[in-house]
Structures are given as C-alpha cells and as structure tokens.
Amino acid sequence: MSDYSATLNLSAPETLNLLLSRRSGSAKRLTGPGPNADQLRRIIAAGIRVPDHGKLAPWRFIVFEGEGRARMGNILAECIAGERDTSPERIEQERNRFMRAPVVIGVVSRVREQIPIPVWEQELSSGAVCMTMLFAAHAMGFVANWITEWCAYHPQVLARVGLKPTEKIAGYIYIGHPAEPLEDRPRPAVDAITTRF
C-alpha cells in the first residue's frame, strides 16, 4: 500500500472488489426504498469528484423523487401523445416511466463553447459523473442504472424540465433496490481489448 493510500484509510482489496462487483439493475425491476436526502447528497457529492478540465463544472442535476416522478410522467405522456399513431397503452407506459425507481437523477451536461477546453472533454466529464454516481450508489448498497431513452433527446421534454437549448441530458440515473436477484452479464476479456505500444 502506498503512503497516499494509507492517508485515505482505504482497504485496497475491498475498494477494488467494490469496483469489480458493480453491475446495473434493470430500471423496470427496481423497488424501494431509495436513498434518503443525506444519501442522495453524498451520491451527488461523489459524482462531482471527477476530472474537470478548467474547473468548469460542466454539469448539473435534476432530482426526480416522490410526486416529482409523477409530474415527469405527465410531461412524458403529454409529449408522446402528440406523436403520430401513439397508442393509449404507450401513453400510459410513458406516464409510469419515472415511477420505475424510487429516485431518478437527471445528469445535465452544460458545456461551454468557444473556450480553450474542448467540448468533448466537457462532455466526457458528464459521463464520468454518471459512472461515479453508479459506484457511489453501489457502495451504499443500492442498485442503479444509467440510461437515456427517448426522453433524453425530445426537445419538448427537455424544455419542460428546464434545460436550456445548449444543455443535454447525459443520462438518467435510476436508483433503488433490486426486486429480484441480479445476474452479471458477460464482460469482454481484458487481453482481447488491450494492446501495448
């Protein structure tokens, strides 16, 4: 163990096992309870400890919980109802989309253009936020899923949840507990995707 790791009071094997054991749980199969206010704050606090070239904080958060999930569902239902050939079943499905988990966090990417920091790096920082929040939720004993779906790209939905035209949804993080045991999916072999230069 290095001198630096000793100052953090971390067990290297336990920390690495935490990273290696993380897996997503289907948003359709999450149940309560979700994180409380303090846990939610800590998940977000962990999320923002990511690489951020230029200290721009090119992200912000929208928390959907309680009745806020139902309000979001109404927005989705209204927006999808305006689409061609939308069935009543589909409208109801969208109305319940954000009810699938106790808490959903929208991670908003808000890049600044025409500055020396590349837009791509700012967007990658938002992706790192999403991933770090998944690890934080996992460390607290929750299951989380990072997804986008159509509602991350629909202009009317984005406007109605307060996004500016220059902002994007990097992901919706669904957090809860698994309603059934999780099964890990196959992962690529490290050697098959690694080259040495």
Predicted regions: what is each one?
Residues 184-197:
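Phosphate/diphosphate-binding glycine-rich loops and adjacent basic-rich segments that engage nucleotide
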